[in-house]
Amino acid sequence: LSYSAFSRDGLIKQLEFEKFPEADAIYAVDHITVDWNEQAAKKAKDYLDTTSFSRDGLIKQLKFEKFTQAQAEYGVSKVGL
């Protein structure tokens, strides 16, 4: 999470992709301390570093990445959109 930003569900899917059993992935994600709002802000910044988005477009992209509506709105606001 220091290198790449993830939503909770996105991180679970990434761990499953890396061949961790679903139950283990869920357990791991539920037992770490993560500010999901800050992860959304980090992911929003990553997107804006490579392309341009409208506020609504970036919120939709973050929701596609499995951030909640509130997390997506926080992230987009944090980067100034």
Walk through the language-model features, giving the residues of each.
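An alpha-helical, amphipathic repeat domain used for nucleic-acid recognition
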Residues: 1-81
